[in-house]
């Protein structure tokens, strides 16, 4: 193996190797992979950093498995306290590992944003106290930061609450691998107090799709074998060496020119946002502030009298492909590798759309906080019929959403 023998139409086949002598083995690393991971550990300033070739999804399952192993033995089903905007990888992990989830719901004024669930430290402390009063101590707290719309949690404050309750904080930082390399200092979750954290290197760093990191903070006592076994449990026995080489090559970039290129990208993005603010106030969400990340352009299509999907289609027709669109928002993700020409293309497209869009007072329907609060309360009040594992693995059928009232959702709907 491999069957292509280093030859083929793509041109990269000679680099696509397997666990041959000298190439090391990802889940039993002792040679060049272990050394490369040690280099990444030093670059990110973590206690330990491990590679994944199957994205943050593999890392999420592994870190939840580790957190379950770390909890003291106790009666009852394990429960995780998690913000409701979690990626579906968390739900699949709950099905595989068979734990329950107690949700932290977003504030009512976030009703129109499926991807956002801001959690205040006081709210987290209250939720933990309520669980304790019920005799249910979670094995950890799970947050997504940054989220898809570019909002970040108060990781420092929230980690302090977790640690005061003797719990680990797990952070899905899939969109924030670059946060350690900001010129003003690291805003990476591990430096802010998270215990376990995943980064999708491929989302914001010069790494092939699938390349990711599992980071451990200094408080995590799991030994080397336990961490590698956790990753192996959820990974292919044939990890991609192309992706591993990409992760290794990124170390040199991160140690050399990345911070400067990242700063240039942020400057270009800031200039564009200021232009958009002048054209259509409220179109671009802020890039600065304690609860915003600086490398995600989130557009509120309501400022143009459009839906998010309409704005995304208008951009697509002008040669710009968006990362995400929903009924209200559009998300674009530049990186340190984005060129001046690409920013110019985006600028031209947005100027044209602003010129053609309806008056700014035409907007999508406003969110109804009261209706959202009622919905969240009704969902929480429903008796549980199945565990997540039972629902995901049960026989299923596809039906129209209008006919789903009173039925049990068998898989993530987003």
Residue ranges and their predicted role:
Residues 23, 50-52, 141-144, 298, ...:
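Short glycine-rich or small-residue beta-strand-to-loop segments that form or flank ligand, phosphate
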Residues 21, 274-278, 285, 299-414:
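Non-catalytic terminal extensions of PLP-dependent enzymes
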Residues 269-270, 288-298, 329-330:
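Conserved glycine-rich beta-strand-loop-beta hairpin in the small C-terminal domain of fold type I
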Residues 20-49:
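Active-site-flanking structural segment that lines cofactor/substrate pockets
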